[in-house]
From Swiss-Prot:
UniProt protein name: Golgi to ER traffic protein 4 homolog
Subunit structure: Component of the bag6/bat3 complex.
Signal peptide segment: none
Name of the coding gene: get4
GO cellular component: BAT3 complex; cytosol
Annotated compartments: Cytoplasm, Cytosol
Length: 322
């Protein structure tokens, strides 16, 4: 027998052994021997880990967690879910979409109000930074956002959409959020905040997609500009200005639409950061003019009218995105 054939036989035996073990554990759960089954899962997990069988350990815990969830054994299920994460951490496994989908599935099965869920998602996002994204893998954020949207936890869903790359999904959630929880007079503010925050995260593409999708799908908004709401016209012009990178255009926009921008005190904070990122505005400093406009006017007088976005400051004080 060749070495390759021997490896195949060994792998088949391992799968067969794992399946037999899972069958026995499932039978214990079905009989109601939850505590005994839970302890057996834990024993097998640490045995597999000590043998560096990380994939086997992870698959066993993932299937076991789902089984316990199906029998409403939430504490045991949450514990095995944490062991799934532990196996990923100890194996230093590469971040794969399948693993992210499994983590999101376990998250969706947990009690939304449980402290275990909070601990699980925090740890999962931290592990996922091994792939892409300082605040967690965008794919995981997107999956979490969809689950929270289904639970009508719109504010938490919006946070995770912001750290994903799914502008379209974010817009559709915001349309529902606006319809379910907002006033008719605030339909423009839901999308304005999202666009400004996406731009603060240097995600121009998602900012554009969320705006176009939201305005197309919201029943209380015209499908195309110009819009009745001045704030929507400002956001539309801002997205065009970001592509052009002209400081003069940005300054005039902020000046002309000040009445609309005063509706939320955070807008000028976001715009100050956007000015730094895309229009070469230096970080906020004390000014005789005061505020955002003063900073913009100082920038114009100090750098000329043809300041380009490519020379924008990459570093500045971060803005807390809720």
């Amino acid at each position: 027998m060749s070495e390759q054939e021997a490896l195949k036989c060994s792998s088949a035996r391992n799968r067969g052994g794992t399946q037999r073990v899972e069958g026995k554990l499932r039978a214990s759960v079905e009989k109601g021997d939850y505590y005994e089954a839970h302890q057996m899962y834990r024993t097998l997990f640490f045995r597999y880990i000590s043998q560096a069988k990380h994939t086997d350990a992870r698959e066993l815990m993932y299937n076991g967690a789902q089984l316990f969830f199906s029998y409403n054994q939430l504490n045991s299920a949450a514990d095995l879910s944490m062991l799934v994460l532990e196996s990923l951490e100890k194996s230093e496994a590469k971040v794969e979409d399948e693993d992210l989908e499994h983590l999101a599935k376990l998250f969706s099965l947990m009690d939304p109000n449980s402290p275990e869920r909070v601990a699980f998602v925090s740890r999962a996002l931290k592990w996922s930074t091994g792939g892409s994204g300082k605040l967690g893998a965008p794919k995981l954020h997107q999956l979490l956002a969809v689950t929270l949207w289904k639970e009508q936890n719109y504010s938490e869903s919006r946070y995770h959409f912001l750290h994903s790359s799914d502008g379209e999904g974010c817009a559709q959630m915001l349309v529902e959020y606006s319809a379910q929880r907002g006033f008719r007079s605030e339909v423009d503010m839901f999308v304005a905040q999202a666009v400004l925050q996406f731009l603060c995260l240097k995600n121009k593409n998602s900012a554009s997609v969320v705006f176009s999708t939201y305005t197309q799908k919201h029943p209380s908004i015209e499908k195309d500009p110009p819009f009745v709401q001045p704030l929507l016209n400002f956001i539309w012009f801002l997205l065009l200005a970001v592509d052009g990178g002209k400081l003069t255009v940005f300054t005039v926009l902020c000046e002309q639409y000040q009445p609309s921008l005063k509706r939320d005190p955070m807008y000028n904070e976001y715009l100050d950061r956007i000015g730094q990122l895309f229009f070469g505005v230096p970080p906020k400093q004390s000014s005789s003019y005061g505020g955002l406009l003063g900073n913009l006017l100082n920038s114009l007088m100090g750098s000329g009218e043809d300041e380009e976005g490519e020379e924008a400051q990459e570093h500045g004080s971060p803005i807390e995105l809720d």
